Amino acid sequence: MIKKVPVLLFFMASISITHASQTATKSLGVSITLSKAQCKINNRAGISGSFVLPMISTSGQIISSKKFTTVPIIIDCTAGGNVNQLEITFGDNSSKKIDSTTWYTTNKDLGLRFSWTKDKTQGFNLGVAHNINKSIWLEGNKKFNASVDVSPVVIRNTVQGGQYTSALPVTVTFI
């Protein structure tokens, strides 16, 4: 039986309104709910809590010491028997997709870029199912690391200061 579990990641980004010497932070709210799943995410905690995205200036420069925020996604399928196929899909092919790694926020000049935390050489494609039932993703017996690093990115040269949000649909499929 194929089970598809839709989830939604919410991201919030802040832009520095004046100078890089002024600082402010904004939380990144993320939540996932799984029902009747044979696999559990982050030890049944799902993904919740706040994650702070790096601050960027209106000229598009990241002014934080860390250039990305890691969103942990550890999928544990040890309690559910055999898992023949395990896929995760971030986003879709909607107009919110800028390219294979970048998603728009509520400001069309500001996007969020995604990459795999575990292996940066693995291609990340929004709207494409990624088979993570492979040794490269393995953390332990039937435990897989699908964590992503999220970076704010200015699409054009400058962006107006303010707070912007984005919602990224995520689907976990297991057979």
UniProtKB/Swiss-Prot annotation:
Site (Required for stability and transport): F174
Protein name stated in the entry: Protein FanH
Purpose: Involved in the biosynthesis of K99 fimbriae.
Keywords: Disulfide bond, Fimbrium, Plasmid, Signal
Entries under InterPro entries matching the protein: Adhesion_dom_fimbrial_sf
Subcellular location: Fimbrium
Example of a GO biological process term: cell adhesion
Gene3D superfamilies assigned to the protein according to its UniProt record, in alphabetical order: Fimbrial-type adhesion domain
